[in-house]
A protein has these predicted regions:
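Secretory pathway export signals and precursors
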Residues: 29-30, 147
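Generic detector of low-complexity/intrinsically disordered segments
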Residues: 9-14, 18-20, 46, 51, ...
């Protein structure tokens, strides 16, 4: 009888140990979102993208194809000039038949939520939650340069109203575009020095909500 109890206890302990080991292996095997560089080249974005259910970036890249329907080499030949990306004309706004950008001045009111893929030294924003393909930006903008901001993603809330140029985004980088972008312009916001997201943060116009 006692031998049987000892055998059951040993089996129970072995099961717990095995389960714990397997759970640890599974946890270690789960990749971090937007980790590494695709094929060792950060221009191509991260090796691993979040699943559609992984907030906050997963839903924004669901179905995303980093090269569109092109191969890697054709994509780079079209959009990489040797020292940087070939960005679209007129700051990426959709163009009228005469080549003028479709944009208008808009005041972003307090509590408006915005985001961007890229460093805080940039001058473009979008409404929070816009799909990545509608932004028509390169795959490199998803690369994790700062581990504190996976997928290079930053989210903000307006704390003091300010004006921007807003308008529809033209297709580029083999992405559909069609979203709305907000372009910062020093002429629209009083102050000194270069106007970028970092300036808006330090001057009380935005707060981070990551």
């Amino acid at each position: 009888m006692f031998a049987g109890k000892r055998l059951l206890a040993a089996l129970f302990t072995a099961t717990l140990v095995l389960f714990g080991v397997n759970a640890g292996v599974s946890a270690q095997a789960a990749p971090e979102v937007c980790a590494g560089a695709f094929q060792g080249d950060n221009r191509l974005g991260p090796e691993t993208l979040p699943k559609p259910t992984q907030q906050p970036v997963g839903p924004l890249v669901a179905g995303y194809k980093r090269f569109g329907d092109l191969g890697k080499d054709a994509f780079l030949a079209k959009y990489w000039n040797g020292t940087g990306w070939n960005y679209p004309p007129q700051d990426g706004f959709w163009l009228k038949p005469d080549g003028a950008p479709i944009k208008y001045k808009r005041t972003l009111q307090k509590n408006t939520r915005l985001d961007r893929f890229g460093s805080e030294f940039g001058g473009f924003l979008a409404h929070k939650g816009a799909h990545y393909s509608t932004r028509a930006i390169p795959p490199q903008s998803l690369y994790t340069f700062d581990p504190a901001y996976r997928c290079n993603y930053h989210a903000y809330q307006v704390t003091k109203a300010f004006a921007v140029w807003e308008g529809p985004i033209a297709p580029w980088f083999e992405q559909s575009g069609g979203g709305l972008q907000q372009k910062l312009d020093r002429a629209l916001v009083p102050g000194d020095g270069a106007l970028n997201v970092a300036w808006l943060l330090s001057n009380g116009y935005l707060v981070r909500i990551n």
